[in-house]
Amino acid sequence: MSATDLDMEGFARLVAAAPQSSWQARILRLAPGDSNRFTAFCREQRIVQSDTIERQLADLAQARLPAASPAERDQFVADAVAAAGDAVAVGAWAYLPWQATVVHLLDRDAYFELITNRNRDKITQAEQERLRTKRVGVLGLSVGGESAVTVAQEHLCGEIVLADFDRLDLSNLNRLQAGVDELGLRKTTIVARRIARIDPYLTVTVFEDGVTSSNLGTFLAGLDLLIEECDGLLIKHEVRLQARALGVNVVYAGDERGFLSVEPYAHWPTLRPFHGLVETPPLPRERYPTSIAFMKALTEWLGGWSNISERSQRSLACVGETLCGYPQLASEARYAAGQIGHVARRLLLGERLHPFVGNLDLAKYLPVEDAC
């Protein structure tokens, strides 16, 4: 039992005090004989109980004993319940306060074993255990939010650190995996909740006011990898200077023509920040004379104005006049997250990747046939 896990009394105190705006799952461990009291308490507090523990045990039996007969798997389930002394005491319960729901789950190690089972052997068990020791930071939670969830879902780390100061607006729903019931919430809250619903045991740390020069060192401390996806040009530049000094690898993907940057500072300590493409510190946004001037500066982080698509160029020329912001699509955000997941997995497993900056542009590989 972890020091932060709750018993029945601790759970009751938490429910009485915890705000429903929380993003953190809490782990509850019940003792044999707690069932009636627990059920009555949840009913009184209008907390939904979700209990599929026998189905999870059967799933675990199939993963561990793929050649076993149905009777042998049934015996595996019965033995697990008997060993706990009571079905309610098998494993643990995860309390999701924002959903007023408590979910019965396998214990931490069995949960990890089962949720990563279908990764095998694209990721081996030994690799998965190694990844479990890693700490990954994600700065900026638009494309970064999808990347964070991808990293969590593949279990590429044991702790993930999320940073963004922004809140969800309706116009974000064209690309972010969120719902209308989450409008106005912090993006850190939304992403942390998504991760908690996938794996409530995964350690999540949140910088809900984002990252600035004053807390950048704290954010980077102990990271094995930084996924950089923020919009602030100054912090994009500064974070690379500090990451290089600390030997922290940086990966960044833009939702524009499959743009990808891999900056493996751990093995390439003399690599210039962002491959030397942005040599001088950018100006603060308010110092740019026009919207298009700022947008052109932003495209330096996508390989330059000439490197973005014609449609994006036309759109950016209208920002501040007929359009309010940079065009972004859900499919491109998901594609970027997939690229980041691939690179993150290889870097975190110790592969000595070469620096890379360029486009993995699907339009290039799927050209339009010329008309006859």
Spell out what each predicted region is.
Residues 147, 151, 191, 337-345:
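Buried hydrophobic packing segments
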Residues 2-82, 222-331, 335, 361-372:
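E1/E1-like adenylate-forming module used to activate ubiquitin-like modifiers
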Residues 102-136:
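A short, basic/flexible loop-to-alpha-helix module at the beginning of a structural domain
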Residues 72-113:
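N-terminal, Lys/Arg-enriched amphipathic/low-complexity engagement segments
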Residues 188-224, 230-237:
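A structured beta-alpha segment of the ubiquitous adenosine-cofactor-binding alpha/beta core
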Residues 127-169:
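Glycine-rich adenosine-cofactor-binding loop
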Residues 267, 272, 335-354:
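Oxidoreductase and adenylate-handling cofactor-binding alpha/beta cores
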Residues 162-199:
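Glycine-rich phosphate-binding loop and adjoining beta1-alpha1-beta2 segment
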